[in-house]
Structure formats: structure tokens, C-alpha cells
From Swiss-Prot:
Protein name according to UniProt: Uncharacterized protein YhaI
Name of the encoding gene: yhaI
Organism listed in the record: Bacillus subtilis (strain 168)
Top-rank lineage group of the source organism: Bacteria
Amino acid sequence: MDSMDHRIERLEYYIQLLVKTVDMDRYPFYALLIDKGLSKEEGEAVMRICDELSEELATQKAQGFVTFDKLLALFAGQLNEKLDVHETIFALYEQGLYQELMEVFIDIMKHFD
């Protein structure tokens, strides 16, 4: 039987091959997580942040808020240090995740660039 190290090495190789065969342009956020080496827990934390901020965005819109700069600041402050804020926002948007929230963030960033 193969040693555990050889089995892990083989699985890593298979995953690298699978990543090359999948159209990663369709899944830029997942590709970003893989590229930056985030763990499952770290990836789930990003999703949890987006869930919470999406709920807060809906609440603030219902209350009549029109500026959401503080939500972007919260996102940037809570985002894993392995990830770039701009790159993550565009990857989430392009993959179709948290579209409304990411559109708001992109609009804010356009005003500062």
C-alpha cells in the first residue's frame, strides 16, 4: 500500500490536473480561493461575511440609506489577508455571487479610482 505522503502527493497532482481541465473563467472566485491557498474554513468565512453584509445592505436600503461605503470598509477589514479586496470583489461578481452587494462595492470603487 502507498504511504500516506505518496497518496497525498498523488491527490494534489490530480487536483492540479482537474483545475486545468475546468473552465476557471466561469468560476473566478473559486479559482482565486485555490490560487491563494485558502482552507475550507477560510473560504466559508468569506461567504459568511458576504451573507452578513448582503443582509445589512438590504436592511440599510429598506431604511432609506443611499451610501454604503461603510459596508465596503467592513468587507475590506474582515477579508482574509491572503485575498486582495478588489480582486475578490470582481471575482465574486463575475461568478454571479452576491451580485447586488458586489455591484454596490464596484460602484463605490469606481468613485475612488
